[in-house]
Design a protein with these regions (language model features):
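NAD(P)+-binding Rossmann beta1-loop-alpha1 motif at the extreme N-terminus of oxidoreductases
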Residues: 2-104, 118, 128-131, 162, ...
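Methionine-biased hydrophobic packing positions in alpha-helices, especially
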Residues: 52, 56, 104, 117, ...
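Hydrophobic residues within alpha-helices
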Residues: 56-60, 153, 194
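Short glycine-/small-residue-rich Rossmann-like dinucleotide-binding loops
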Residues: 99, 105-107, 124, 142
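Rossmann-like adenosine-cofactor binding region
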Residues: 106-114
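Rossmann-fold dinucleotide-binding core
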Residues: 115-182
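Helical "substrate-binding/catalytic lid" subdomain
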Residues: 169-302
């Protein structure tokens, strides 16, 4: 079962994460034979400085943590170096310099196998906008002891950290969250495109949604119609944000997990089909809200701000 396999990957001896992971570096000078977590984690390593990771690392720096970073992109490392941040050439060097290491990487295949007695899988919700603002929500799986120790890190990068249970539960929660998000985005996009076809402006319909029973994040915070809302991917040709290929990946995980669990999943299957088609048509790098334009053929709007 997909979730069971995820839990096995999040074991202390072989930890891999598709999103954000936290683990306590194994350093003899830090740990006793009982492997108790220290009460204060000041030196933070950060591996993965993409659209999300760079912003999260910046928020840790602003919060006063001593941060050491690594990324395969040398240009990104140069930017952090010019900011006075310590940079390392390898993940191992980051680990040696840190009390705790954070990874923010696109898939499990990108995460190194490292020996670590304490680990949390902690996927995030909120996207680039929340990463920039420091208002992410973390879904956390692992030991309660490690969760308690990591709270200062979470609340330096986000507004909430929800403990979901044992190892792998954070990723399980993230899969379910993104399934609901994908389905809601499809519903909002379909309704707005239909409204346009019936002569109701998407901006007008969005106002109705946002003060009625149809209100949801895809409508009031991440509107998919270009011209309706500023500062979201639809306002910049669907660049930035959460790539359609990543949404398709999460829907594949959700579908596989549902099959293994014996759960009915008709909406998952349909959403999976639509996002796979979207990616196959060349829109895999665009934000997942581009489904409004490239699947439903909805129209841009020009709204007086």
């Amino acid at each position: 079962m997909a979730i069971c396999r995820l839990r096995s990957l999040f074991s202390p001896s072989k930890c891999k994460s598709s999103s954000f992971s936290f683990y306590q570096s194994f350093k003899p000078r830090t740990f006793s034979s009982s492997h108790h977590l220290p009460s204060h984690l000041q030196n933070v390593g950060f591996i993965g400085l993409g659209n999300m990771g760079s912003r999260m690392a910046n928020n840790l720096i602003k919060a006063g943590f001593s941060v050491t970073v690594h990324d395969l992109n040398s240009d990104v490392l140069d930017k952090f170096s010019h900011m006075g941040v310590a940079t390392k050439k390898t993940p191992c060097e980051v680990s040696e310099a840190s009390d705790v290491v954070v990874t923010m990487l696109p898939s499990s295949a990108h995460v190194c196998d490292l020996e670590k007695p304490f680990m949390l899988d902690a996927p995030v919700s909120g996207g680039v906008i929340a990463a920039e603002a420091g208002t992410l929500t973390f879904m956390v799986g692992g030991s309660e002891e490690a969760f308690a120790a990591a709270k200062p890190l979470f609340f330096s990068m986000g507004k909430g950290a929800i403990y979901c249970g044992g190892a792998g539960n954070g990723s399980a929660a993230k899969i379910c969250n993104n399934l609901a998000l994908a389905v809601s985005m499809l519903g909002v996009s379909e309704a707005l495109a239909l409204g346009q076809s019936l002569g109701v402006a998407a901006s007008t319909l969005s106002k109705i949604f946002n003060c009625s029973s149809a209100r949801c994040w895809s409508s009031d915070s991440y509107n998919p119609v270009p011209g309706v809302m500023e500062g979201v991917p639809s306002s910049r040709d669907y660049n930035g944000g959460f790539a359609s290929k990543l949404m398709a990946k999460d829907l594949n995980l959700a579908a596989e997990s549902a099959k293994q669990a014996g759960c009915k999943h008709p909406l998952t299957s349909q959403a999976q089909k639509i996002y796979t088609e979207l990616c196959n048509e060349g829109h895999e790098g665009k934000d997942f809200s581009c489904v409004f334009r490239h699947y439903y053929t909805g129209m841009d709007e020009h709204v007086d701000q």
